[in-house]
Amino acid sequence: MTLNPAPNSFRTGPDERGRFGIFGGRFVAETLMPLILDLEKAYADAKADPSFKADMESYGTHYIGRPSPLYFAERLTEHLRAQAPAGQGAKIFFKREELNHTGSHKVNNVLGQILLARRMGKPRIIAETGAGQHGVATATLCARFGLKCVVYMGAVDVERQAPNVFRMKMLGAEVIPVQSGTRTLKDAMNEALRDWVTNVSDTFYCIGTVAGPHPYPAMVRDFQSVIGIETKQQMLEMEGRLPDSLIACIGGGSNAMGLFHPFLDDRDVEIYGVEAAGHGVQSGLHAASLTGGRPGVLHGNRTYLLMNEDGQIADAHSISAGLDYPGIGPEHAWLHEMGRVTYLSATDAETLEAFKLCSMLEGIIPALEPAHALSKVMELAPTKPAEHLMVLNLSGRGDKDIPQVAQIFGQTL
């Protein structure tokens, strides 16, 4: 008998306490518990209300531009087959979330949370952001619905993501640079939580990933699951069957969970998540929580975290501001321990190679975040048979990264 027998379904979590096995839960200040419970009830009510689903679908179609295309990356497929033994080399598809309004998958979740905030009568929205994509999506939806928007962003990220900072301000958001700690995503989330405790009556906290206290990990996953639901349908239409493998990058892990969740019980579908290895996991300068971390509690949930010997949260590093987080969503931690998803990591250097290759071969400049996953597609695809169907979640476009990448390549803009 195995200690962790595979469950009948990988899609039933979390339990009523918000746990995925030993992960998840809600470790929050007493002040926040009433808010969390209100949110849980409001979300349960919204899920049961056909008008909420109808609004999600209507705005998804007419405002976001869903469904996003599933695209056969023909030249990348040919390029990798040329390096593979005869008869090898997977057929590669991109789920093109970068074509959504605002340029990434983030808007799927924000739409759901903003519609929920309106149902709850909360006129002030706060959010944390790393790469700025979640901040831009939140500012965008707040502008659309006439809500006040405050975005917390680490001061380091404010510098390296200047185009997105300007976008948020153009959309009417107040952007607050966070100077504490490492001045990145973790610290932005800390400040947003402090704000929420202080302004409980009128404020809704729009979390950007599948982390935080319950019900956030499940709620964000549900709003992002449109990615996987569409992929299933599109692949059946294009190829007459399900894909053989899925691959996505992971910071907190919402784009990955959105793609993965609808496929978790399709046991023949291989699933790969790709963390940020920075300068290499052995260097200590990385953001690969599953590869280089251990279980602990941060931002209201128990999950895998980067910690030092004393249990203090360690600094994360990634070339990509959106993956520069010392933790991972609790459902990913559980799927890792259950063995359902294989978690890999990609270095900054591997990511830049993939970024260049995708741009040159497909005419698509990817964000640095999905370029991490793309680097593992370049490794995995040549090892698979030619009939193998592989789907990459192209979760964001690279416009925001052009100044940073140009600087790395020694170009002056």
From Swiss-Prot:
Gene3D superfamilies given in the database record: 3.40.50.1100
UniProt keyword list: Amino-acid biosynthesis, Aromatic amino acid biosynthesis, Lyase, Pyridoxal phosphate, Tryptophan biosynthesis
InterPro entries xrefs: Trp_synth_b_CS, Trp_synth_beta, Trp_synth_beta/beta-like, TrpB-like_PALP, TrpB-like_PALP_sf
One GO cellular component, as annotated: cytoplasm
Catalytic activity annotation: (1S,2R)-1-C-(indol-3-yl)glycerol 3-phosphate + L-serine = D-glyceraldehyde 3-phosphate + L-tryptophan + H2O
Residues annotated with N6-(pyridoxal phosphate)lysine modification: 106
Pathway: Amino-acid biosynthesis; L-tryptophan biosynthesis; L-tryptophan from chorismate: step 5/5
Any Pfam family matching the protein: PALP
Enzyme Commission number, as recorded: 4.2.1.20
Needed cofactors: pyridoxal 5'-phosphate
A GO molecular-function annotation: tryptophan synthase activity
HAMAP family found in the cross-reference section: Trp_synth_beta (MF_00133)
Family: Belongs to the TrpB family.
Known function: The beta subunit is responsible for the synthesis of L-tryptophan from indole and L-serine.
Subunit structure: Tetramer of two alpha and two beta chains.
Protein name: Tryptophan synthase beta chain
Species annotation: Methylorubrum extorquens (strain CM4 / NCIMB 13688) (Methylobacterium extorquens)
Gene: trpB
